Amino acid sequence: MAKPRAARRPASVYALAGIRLFNGVTGLLMPTVLIRRLDPDRDLSPAAVYAFRLFGIRTILLGLDLLTNRGQRLQEDLREGVLIHGSDTATAALLGIRGQLPPRTAALTTLISAVNTALAASAADFGKRKGK
């Protein structure tokens, strides 16, 4: 008996999953790479290493969810992605506004997070239309 074919996901879901997997693996296995990109002029903080590893594994799992979940669970994941990445965008922008990140770093992290937010919104919109 043949299995029913799974519905195809939009490119935005695959792009967002890829970004999450890349960032998650980097955060988990090579947190110093990400820390140095954010704050190249300071000594490494053990707390920053911990935080990147902590969120690294969570980010990997969120990426895998986009590739493996289906139906209502996938739609929930897509809606949650807008909140997750929107929060990241606001955080990056605030760090820049407050001068807690160098201007170039703040602009780049805000832009990257905004692209992720747009991908999440696009995917969530697709999921909403497919669910109707």
Give names to the regions the model predicted.
Residues 1-132:
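Short amphipathic, positively biased membrane-proximal segments
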